[in-house]
Amino acid sequence: MRTLILLPLLLIACSKNQPAPAAPEPTGGATTITAQIDQGKQLYVDKCSKCHGDAGQGVPDKGPPVVGPEAFPEKPRPNAKRDVDFHTAADVFAWTSKHMPGNAPGSLTTDQYLAIFAFDLTANGVKLDKPLDGPAAQAIVLHP
């Protein structure tokens, strides 16, 4: 099993010369995409909705939209917490798993972050046929 590497994706923004890191891998979470999405929905309500809204629409002065056309822009918004570009779902995952939730950054398991992101991707119209993992996240190009 490959070693889970989250932080190097974030460092790419600081140094274009570094090689791409290995993708995060789940450690035994949901075995079906339906179960992963259901788990992600509940985790989203519990951990994310206060700042990102009950439908992912964003909350002014708390958190940006995570569902809809304004979700996950390639470049950071002015005054955003993030300072990295989002080209793939793996980029979003790497940043989110280090910086979210805002009141307890990095406090969830890899499987929990993947579940939330699987829920969020499907809410944005991305079709997932199997549970989201690192290789699948790297293959989802948000901004070519």
Regions found by a protein language model. Give the residues of each.
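Gly/Gly-Pro-rich "capping" loops immediately C-terminal to redox-active cysteine motifs
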Residues: 56-92
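Sec-dependent signal peptide recognition
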Residues: 1-7
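C-terminal motif of bacterial Sec signal peptides marking the signal peptidase cleavage site
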Residues: 11-13
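Electrostatic cytochrome c docking/interface patches
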Residues: 18-43, 59, 104
